[in-house]
């Protein structure tokens, strides 16, 4: 039976008889460390293929101007109010007024978004004695009007006019405390965009050709 050293020598391992300190011979037999020239590659790096996630690739060419399907807007007004009892009626009135008085302009109006903290107020009321004052809830409405910057002044003036001309209700009531309050203020915020935002014409109030 061949010895292990003979087998290793047959495999190409450097084998010799150790007569001196073992550490010195082990250091001599240690294979050289790989250098930059001992490991080479002939394959060329393959560039990463990043999918095109641009608007053009997902939804086709982005509209760069007025066309048959899209309208561009760069100005937005937000109509906001807190604790407005007739919030739906108020925004419906604004929307109808803008449609009539601004018939020569192309605009877009969103539906009214309403937020309320009444549910949390009711939970607090169940855990509080009736003698303690309950924190009143806040109801908020938000409606957005989009237009072009060239028409922003007319839109702004008309929004202020229709809000100031609203008929005050007999009373305004907060749902949590039941007390009456004066007319609730309505706020108008104006935003301008650097790039136009395009909406489909199905969601736009088109300008009346006869009013132009």
From Swiss-Prot:
Pfam families in the cross-refs: Herpes_UL3
Keywords noted in UniProt: Host nucleus, Phosphoprotein
Protein's UniProt name: Nuclear phosphoprotein UL3 homolog
Compartmental location: Host nucleus
Recorded family membership: Belongs to the alphaherpesvirinae HHV-1 UL3 family.
Keyword Phosphoprotein assigned: yes
InterPro entries named among the record's database cross-references: Herpes_UL3 (IPR005035)
Keyword Phosphoprotein: yes
Organism the protein comes from: Equine herpesvirus 1 (strain Ab4p)
Posttranslational modification: Phosphorylated.
A cellular component term, taken from the record's GO annotations: host cell nucleus
